[in-house]
A protein has these predicted regions:
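Divalent metal-cofactor coordination and adjacent catalytic microenvironments
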Residues: 1-99
Length: 99
């Protein structure tokens, strides 16, 4: 995971539910890393491009690609009732920074 790092996710996402408890925060960070690793694999499987190729083509990883990949990991990571609204227990809201 050279390109979609924990730092990149924190830079490009609003992460709600941060904890002052170091142990709880470590668990949150581990979950984010797990999401990022799985998201990178999902992107490659579906569009056949790795992150270096995407960055070469677009100059960055487009927010929609990151958002879709992170959302696709939710069912793999979090247990949820299919009748419930689709949501992370910890909300990741990708956005594009204004320049």
């Amino acid at each position: 995971m050279d390109f979609l790092t924990l730092d990149l996710i924190k830079t490009h996402c609003r992460i709600e539910g941060y904890s002052e408890d170091p142990d709880e925060q470590r668990k949150i960070d581990e979950t984010i890393k797990k999401c990022a690793n799985q998201a990178e694999g999902i992107v490659y499987e579906h569009i056949g491009k790795d992150y270096p190729a995407i960055i070469k083509e677009y100059g960055e990883i487009p927010t929609r690609i990151m958002q879709a990949a992170l959302m696709a990991t939710a069912d793999m990571i979090f247990e949820r009732d299919p009748k419930e609204n689709y949501a992370f227990k910890m909300i990741l809201k990708p956005y594009k920074k204004k320049e």
